[in-house]
Amino acid sequence: MGLVQMSSKELERYALIRRVVGKELGQSFAAAQLGLSVRQIKRLCAAYRAQGAQGLISKQRGRASNRQTKPNTRSRIMALVHTHYSDFGPTLACEYLQSQHGVTLSSETLRQWLIADGLWKPRVRRAKRAHPSRERRPCAGELIQIDGSPHAWFEDRAPNCTLIAFIDDATSKVMGARFYPTETTVAYLDVLERHVRQHGRPVSLYSDRHGVFTNHKESANTPTQFGRACLQLEIESILALSPQAKGRVERLFQTLQNRLVKALRLAGISDIESANRYLEETYIAAHNKRFGVEAHNPQDAHRAYAGTDVDLKRICALHHKRQYSSTLACQ
């Protein structure tokens, strides 16, 4: 008998089957050790008696898998990737291949192809500093995390701008998001007004300590313009002490800086007005379907706004105190 190459698994199987054939072990014991049925052990014993060790080697060795992708199929898919999705990650590229080209492929298969073509580098998993996860609020509308992200949202096609987003803590759904030239009080008040119109008044808003939300002047107890609007709308304003505390909105922007930037590019969008229309009509709904979760409690904690549209606009506008001089000039 010539030299037979075996894997470690096949060597273990060979050692046990040989002892079963030699009446040193029972078939039931061997079946339990190998995780096989007694019927399979009987087949292996018969193969060993007929062919020796060669009979225990897998018949699939050296044969291409029936599930292996055909070379011409791989070439066609990678041509699409190189043309449209060369800087996409495997998961996102798979989603676009499915939705835009009708190509169904596992992200792991595509990841291997991207690595082979030099389009993706395997990530080294680094130990992360532990930040205890805060439990989600049970109801939608109980806590809305808000923040703004200045970024090259249109890449090199237009100047940088800021995306302001409101995300629900209970569901991770984007409740509102809009682009603005810069991160300003007026921008936040605009998103707040839109949120109240569409969803109602949330119980609380969770933000960082940006000057829009807190007055940094010493001994200044007066609220900011945004804080005053929250007071008038009876919305609690909570200030986070660290970025990790409002992790959901931070992770949202990480996702959007990857996915939304590419979506805007593929849609040929390079201006704020078109981008806001795209967010409202297309992107937010698709994002929430992909990443949203169900709240633990199905009750919505948003409260209806009983005032008029004019009242809401007045609340969400900038307020300034003025006085009249003796000549009735407004100062």
What are these regions (language model features)?
Residues 3, 7, 18, 27-82:
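Short, basic alpha-helical/linker "hinge" immediately adjacent to a nucleic-acid-recognition surface
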Residues 16, 30, 41-44, 52, ...:
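Mobile genetic element proteins and their domesticated derivatives, centered on retroelements
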Residues 52-146, 151-152, 298-309:
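Basic, flexible linker segments flanking DNA-binding modules
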Residues 68, 205-208, 216-231, 235-259, ...:
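RNase H-like two-metal-ion nuclease catalytic core shared by retroviral integrases
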Residues 284-331:
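C-terminal, beta-rich DNA-binding module of retroviral/retroelements integrases
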Residues 72, 83, 103-104, 115-174, ...:
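Mobile-element integrase/transposase regions
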Residues 147, 263-278:
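Short, charged, surface-exposed loops that flank catalytic or proteolytic processing sites
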Residues 25-26, 89:
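Residues that mark the N-terminal boundary/hinge immediately upstream of a DNA-recognition element
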